[in-house]
Design a protein with these regions (language model features):
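C-terminal helix of von Willebrand factor
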Residues: 199-231
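…and closely analogous acidic/polar surface helices at protein-protein or active-site interfaces
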Residues: 41-77, 163-164
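DG-centered beta-turn motif at the end of beta-strands
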Residues: 35-40, 57, 82-85, 125, ...
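Short beta-strand-loop
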Residues: 76-108, 192-200
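VWA/integrin I-like adhesion module and closely mimicked acidic/polar interface patches used
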Residues: 154-201, 207
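Acidic, polar low-complexity linker/tail segments
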Residues: 1-34, 40-50, 133-138
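Von Willebrand factor
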Residues: 90, 103-144, 181-194, 215, ...
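Phosphate/oxyanion-binding active-site loops and adjacent basic polyanion-contact surfaces
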Residues: 53-58, 114-123, 161-162
Length: 231
């Protein structure tokens, strides 16, 4: 289902009223969100929507951050970090975790290169979220469950790293940290065989089934909003 801007605003207002957010304080609560964007060459290919996947991903990430910076709960409690990954390594586009409203003013450049180290990127993202949560706790701030949002076409080039054990090790890390970190995967198309090694199928969605990546990120934004209020 694709939402119009008006529908998104109305849905957010309904959530505010039904969940009674006006009576909830987020001053002493923080939720880290790390967005990992695949920037391998294959992401330069056109999606079913007719434009390069990497451009669709960029628009979607901007939409997500814009929502977080305007949503009453998320703008106060969410710190966001955007990283890209390819054969050149992992690039931190936000310079670490920053308030959503600050990230909304940033301009991101997703430069593509060979290879797609998906498992390495997720491993790094989990460590980053945990480190951010530890920082909250040291500052006497309530550290809520963080999110790792993976955007990819599902083609991992580091699958056989460490004698084929990298997927096992990363999934084990996610399992051990499931109370602290949630992983969700947005995939261009149905090439999810390798992603299945990371998480359960219900955490993997084909973004092209949502009548456009905007609709996927709208759904994701609403999920974050509900999570922030349900804590």
């Amino acid at each position: 289902m694709k939402f119009s801007q008006k529908q998104e605003i109305e849905l957010s207002a309904i959530l505010n009223r039904r969940l009674g957010f006006d009576d909830i304080s987020t001053e002493n609560r923080k939720m880290p969100v790390c967005v990992c964007v695949d920037s391998s060459y294959s992401m330069s290919e056109d999606s079913l929507l007719g434009s390069p996947r990497i451009e669709e991903a960029k628009k979607g990430v901007r939409k997500l951050i814009s929502f977080m910076s305007s949503d009453r709960a998320l703008r106060n409690m969410t710190d966001v970090c955007v990283i890209t990954y390819n054969g050149n390594g992992i690039v931190n586009l936000t310079g670490g975790f920053v308030p959503a409203k600050e990230a909304a003013d940033m301009d991101f450049s997703f430069d593509t290169f060979v290879e797609s180290p998906i498992f390495t990127a997720v491993d790094k993202a989990v460590d980053m979220v945990n480190a951010q949560r530890d920082g909250y706790k040291k500052g006497s701030i309530s550290a809520e469950r963080g999110w790792v949002i993976l955007i990819t076409d599902g083609r991992a080039d580091d699958y056989f790293c460490k004698n084929g054990m990298i997927s096992v090790n990363v999934r084990s890390k996610l399992e051990k940290n499931k109370k602290n970190v949630r992983l969700v995967c947005g995939c261009f198309g149905y090439e999810t065989k390798q992603l299945d090694k990371l998480t359960t199928p219900d955490n993997i969605r084909n973004m092209e089934e949502f009548s456009g990546i905007y609709s996927y990120f709208t759904m994701l934004s609403q999920s974050l909003s509900v999570a922030s209020r349900a804590i």
